[in-house]
Amino acid sequence: MSLILGRFHCLLLLAGLSLCSTVFAQGRSVDYEVQGTVYDGYFVSAGKDAPLVMLVHDWDGLTDYEVKRANMLADMGYSVFAADLFGKGIRPTEVKDKRQHTGELYKDRSKMRSLLRAALKQAQSLGGNTDNAVAMGYCFGGAAVLEWARSGDKLKGFATFHGGLATPEGQDYQHTQGKILVMHGSADTAITMDQFAALTNELESAGVHHEMITYSGAPHAFTVFGSSRYREDADKKSWARFTGFLESELKE
């Protein structure tokens, strides 16, 4: 079912009346198949020439949270494809189920990469400008985005919000092509500052252009609206930096 966001811009007339025009960003769920399994993504277009953002969900699966973030970006002039890495209808609510679905992909990095590339291909089929694209991810999605960066695929940039930072054994960033932006809460007990420092050293050694930012007092999942972990200051600052990253890396 299509989801439509409207933005209303009112022009005041000299007579004291107002005339409102409506600009619509249309978003919709998109079913696509990868190796016999159906996945359910979300695509919102800001126009055929708009830069593209590939968004990867956290361990809850693709939910209203990612849809909201996608629509926020569309309102700024970016087309967005929110990928589904779990499968249609799989939106785990229990921790054990979340661990199961993320764990399966952590153990099968080849499948993770295939799903990311399939999502990019689907975005392209819908008119997304894949030659002018950045990938972003939250938590598990952040780890997936770094996996994508290590694959050597040619995206303009890779951004993570409180994402997993550890590099699997046998992998490195020698083939990474885009710039990397990492936004991390210094009070995150799930992903430690030791991992943050280790990634910084890896990227520096590999010669990857990177920016690593920490936010004091911010725990894991500090951007999730309405949760006990939400930190407004860190959320607003990280979002502002991310949108600045998009402006600098994507051609208008």
Feature locations, PLM:
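A conserved short beta-strand
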Residues: 154-164
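Bacterial N-terminal signal peptides
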Residues: 9-21
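Gly/Ala-rich beta-loop-alpha elbow adjacent to hydrolase catalytic centers
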Residues: 137-141, 145
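Alpha/beta-hydrolase fold nucleophile elbow
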Residues: 127-138
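Conserved alpha/beta-hydrolase "acid-adjacent" motif
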Residues: 190-195
